[in-house]
UniProtKB/Swiss-Prot annotation:
Induction description: Induced by amino acid starvation, glucose starvation, the DNA cross-linker mitomycin C (SOS response) and when translation is blocked. Induction is decreased in the absence of the Lon protease suggesting, by homology to other toxin-antitoxin systems, that Lon may degrade the YafN antitoxin. Transcription is negatively regulated by the cognate locus, probably by YafN. A member of the dinB-yafNOP operon; it has 2 promoters, 1 upstream of dinB and 1 specific for yafN-yfaO.
Listed GO MF terms: ribosomal large subunit binding; RNA binding; RNA endonuclease activity
Name by which UniProt lists this protein: mRNA interferase toxin YafO
Keyword line: DNA damage, DNA repair, Endonuclease, Hydrolase, Nuclease, RNA-binding, SOS response, Stress response, Toxin-antitoxin system
Gene Ontology CC annotation, any one: toxin-antitoxin complex
Domain of life of the native organism: Bacteria
Subunit architecture: Probably forms a complex with the antitoxin YafN which inhibits the mRNA interferase activity.
Amino acid sequence: MRVFKTKLIRLQLTAEELDALTADFISYKRDGVLPDIFGRDALYDDSFTWPLIKFERVAHIHLANENNPFPPQLRQFSRTNDEAHLVYCQGAFDEQAWLLIAILKPEPHKLARDNNQMHKIGKMAEAFRMRF
């Protein structure tokens, strides 16, 4: 499994934060271990979603604050908030390739409706998926 990171997410997080997030992401996707800070994992696919985002199968994971993780007994689907989302995509040809694109915060649901921002994210996903 290979996890790539955009320049954007590298600017949003410290090296230590990005390393920890990457380790959690690998553990989650490869081993099926749900970290305490990971919540609902879903494609952007509602009627307001930018078409390129849908086409490139861009997804997001709700993120809890490390100081206030999701309750362990709460089912993943119910682990939601409007604090932060990890935006990512999977390779189109290589299912073991993943791209961590950005952290949307604050108000990630509102940011996901920003066509300018989502178009940029869609272009990053498109470039990655054309290669992987």
